[in-house]
């Protein structure tokens, strides 16, 4: 099976570099750059131009995924301030902000549909912080009404991973944000350096949540766009549990492609099973390394 290797980017100017480094498309385009550090929301035309630029960088038919505005109390916007929250990581962020400020999401979806029309390309559009099927339905119907053909969600909340067969019903694809998924699964704040041991995506519980998402996804393409995708050894584990697209910082693409090229799907499944059987992140990594091609040790050192 072909595994797509894509890039995470935060600005249209990052797209050509990502392509040069071997990205087959974009697995996560963070649209926040258009919204942060300004007093007013960006216009539809301004957004359309940025989205069209990214779509045109890659070949026709390439997977280019736009994440709708992922802001909130932890990434406050001057023009969409919902007030201070004691625990912003669990507050009105991502899709929850969009449901309060429908004007922002509707303008963004209109701009993405216009960019698709202008370029003749079909963007993948996904919403962050979706926790229930009702939220997935809300976003899907709004996006499709705006003219978006390929609609998805981020899987960052354990409830979505555990109930993927239901939550993913209204959408066409999903992308797992392993950074937030780890934070929520392990009840450990990503910003607390002292909790680094809990926050590694090698946690067997996190790998199990990724597997649960893939197991319930039916024929939908499941990708990973968290830091986990850029680790050549962990990439093999992710493919082994059912992930079919990996998106990472452009600088990590070569090493991940090298690791993938040395393993077939059956080998990846065996590596994943060994990691899942482990009781700790260290054990999971050691077990995976033992079964991987020896060349991978050089790639991850």
Give names to the regions the model predicted.
Residues 1-301:
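Conserved alpha/beta-domain cores
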């Amino acid at each position: 099976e072909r595994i797509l290797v894509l890039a995470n980017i935060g600005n249209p100017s990052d797209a050509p570099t990502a392509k040069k480094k071997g990205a087959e498309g974009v697995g996560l385009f963070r649209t926040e750059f258009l919204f942060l550090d300004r007093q007013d929301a960006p216009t539809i035309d301004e957004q359309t131009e940025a989205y069209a630029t990214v779509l045109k960088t890659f070949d026709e038919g390439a997977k280019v995924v736009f994440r709708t505005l992922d802001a909130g109390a932890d990434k406050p916007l001057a023009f969409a301030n919902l007030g201070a929250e004691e625990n912003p990581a669990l507050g009105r962020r991502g899709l929850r902000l969009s449901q309060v400020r429908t004007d922002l999401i509707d303008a963004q979806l209109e701009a993405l549909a216009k960019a698709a029309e202008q370029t003749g390309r079909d963007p993948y559009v996904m919403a962050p912080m979706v926790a229930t099927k009702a939220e997935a339905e809300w976003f899907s119907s709004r996006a499709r009404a705006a003219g978006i053909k390929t609609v998805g969600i981020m899987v960052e909340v354990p409830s979505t991973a555990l109930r993927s067969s239901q939550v993913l019903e209204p959408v066409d694809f999903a992308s797992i944000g392993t950074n937030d998924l780890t934070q929520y699964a392990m009840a450990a704040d990503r910003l607390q350096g002292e909790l680094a041991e809990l926050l590694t995506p090698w946690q067997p519980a996190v790998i199990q949540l990724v597997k649960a998402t893939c197991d319930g996804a039916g024929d939908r393409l499941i990708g990973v766009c968290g830091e986990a995708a850029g680790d050549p050894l962990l990439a093999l584990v992710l493919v082994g549990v059912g992930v079919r697209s990996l998106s990472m910082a452009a600088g990590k693409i070569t090493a991940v492609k090298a690791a993938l090229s040395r393993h077939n799907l059956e080998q990846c499944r065996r590596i994943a099973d060994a990691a899942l059987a482990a009781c700790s992140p260290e054990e999971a990594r050691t077990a995976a390394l033992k079964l991987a091609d020896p060349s991978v040790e050089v790639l991850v050192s």
